[in-house]
Structure formats: structure tokens, C-alpha cells
Amino acid sequence: MTTKSFQDMLFSLIQQKGWSEKEICEACLLDRPRFTAIKHLNDDAASTHNVTLQVLVALCIGMQLNITVSEQLLALRGYALSKRNPIHNAYRYLIERCSGISIDDANELLTELFAGTGAVLDRILLGSRGYRQGSDK
């Protein structure tokens, strides 16, 4: 049995949905440079720095993937949603319970949840808005 690469799995999911690159960018709130970076990823660590957990979670939510498929996709980039991390729990909740939510609405919810907690919003917000500061795995 061969293991799919991140790109194989992602573009298979996109193809199954029949979405164009423009539709993916809009649904996942990704700018073109970010999506281009995703398209040209390889499996080395150096290619990961622009594709953070927030960007990957935005793909999962924007594409309305279930939690099982989302976790598989995240794992292919070396990420996992920790049950001990409140931000990861919020992401998990959005994936599991808020199917069809827009990334803008998800970001609004995240902002409300973490306002006043001392969390740096650029490290929480999804899509191209959340990649500037990087992310912890």
C-alpha cells in the first residue's frame, strides 16, 4: 500500500469537489501566493515555513472536510490537533461542528473566543490572515 503525499491527497479532494483554484482560494480565504506555495510544497522541512497550521485548518474548514480526513491531511504535513491545546480544540470544534462556516465567520468566532486571553490573534486566525507570525505544531 502506498501512502499518499500531502499534495496527492489535497488535489484529489479538490478534484472530487470539482473546485477551481479560484474557488478554493475564496472558500479557504487564501491569497494566490499562499495557494501557489501549497501547490509547490515538497516533503522537506524548508518548504513548510509558509504553510502553517492555520492555513491547513482553513483548507479543511473551507473544503468542509470531516475531522478524520482533516487529521489525515494535517498529519501529512506533520501537524496534529492536540486535545490539550485550547486553540487546537477550537479548530477541532470548527471542523467537527461548524460544517459550512465561512473562514471569515470562523475567524470572527476565534477572535471572540480568544479576546482577552493574551493570545496573539495572528497566530490563531485562519487562512492567509493567520500565517504572518508562524505557528506552533
Task: Pin down the residues of each PLM region.
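Key DNA-contact positions within bacterial/archaeal DNA-binding proteins
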Residues: 22, 33-36, 68
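A short, Lys/Arg-rich alpha-helix, primarily the initiator
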Residues: 1-23, 27, 102-136
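Short, charged recognition helix plus adjacent turn
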Residues: 71-99, 121-125
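Long, compositionally biased
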Residues: 61-63, 87-116
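DNA major-groove recognition helix of helix-turn-helix/homeodomain DNA-binding modules
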Residues: 51-69
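Recognition helix of helix-turn-helix/homeodomain-like DNA-binding domains
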Residues: 29-51, 75-78
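Short acidic alpha-helix initiation/capping motifs at coil-to-helix transition points
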Residues: 2-4, 13-15, 47-55, 82-87
